[in-house]
């Protein structure tokens, strides 16, 4: 089977069996999902789901989180990986949402990746789950499976894999 045929079969399966992007992360608002996805980097969704309820309760809006400090946020997220950096990113992200985006989570890749702590993968999760846009969060797992299916080559990085996979949508 040729590569293009493999792409088409796989995409057809996902369209039929997984028509709506979902996540295991617990959230009720786009802002909460953004927090959870930032925290999920190098951490399990299970761990993130354990720690976010008090964070969501005490920092329900970008304005409230933006008024906090990384030191305060650290105490809420100390059990995730890289809590110092993530605390700084969360406060910075909230401040930028308030200052530049009227406290709303933006819906474009270009705007999302401007936020502290938000890379392409996080931006793509937000786009697909919150805004139902055709976006693919390529991480090492997607990259590995794509390689095993023969959809990308050994030499590809996750970013190149993303480009290759998007080309066949």
Where are these regions (language model features)?
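Catalytic cores of DNA base-excision repair glycosylases
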Residues: 2-166
């Amino acid at each position: 089977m040729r590569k293009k045929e493999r792409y088409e079969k796989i995409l057809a399966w996902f369209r039929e069996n997984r028509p709506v992007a979902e996540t295991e992360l617990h959230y009720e608002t786009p802002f909460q999902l953004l927090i959870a996805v930032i925290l999920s980097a190098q951490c399990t969704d299970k761990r993130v789901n354990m720690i976010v309820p008090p964070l969501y309760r005490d920092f329900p809006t970008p304005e409230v989180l933006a008024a906090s400090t990384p030191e305060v946020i650290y105490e809420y997220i100390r059990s995730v990986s890289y809590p110092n950096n993530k605390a700084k990113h969360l406060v910075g992200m909230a401040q930028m949402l308030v200052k530049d985006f009227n406290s709303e989570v933006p819906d474009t890749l270009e705007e999302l990746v401007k936020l502290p702590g938000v890379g392409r993968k996080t931006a793509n999760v937000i786009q697909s789950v919150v805004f139902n846009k055709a976006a693919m969060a390529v991480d090492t797992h997607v990259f590995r499976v794509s390689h095993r299916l023969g959809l990308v080559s050994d030499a590809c990085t996750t970013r190149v894999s993303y480009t290759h996979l998007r080309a066949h949508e």
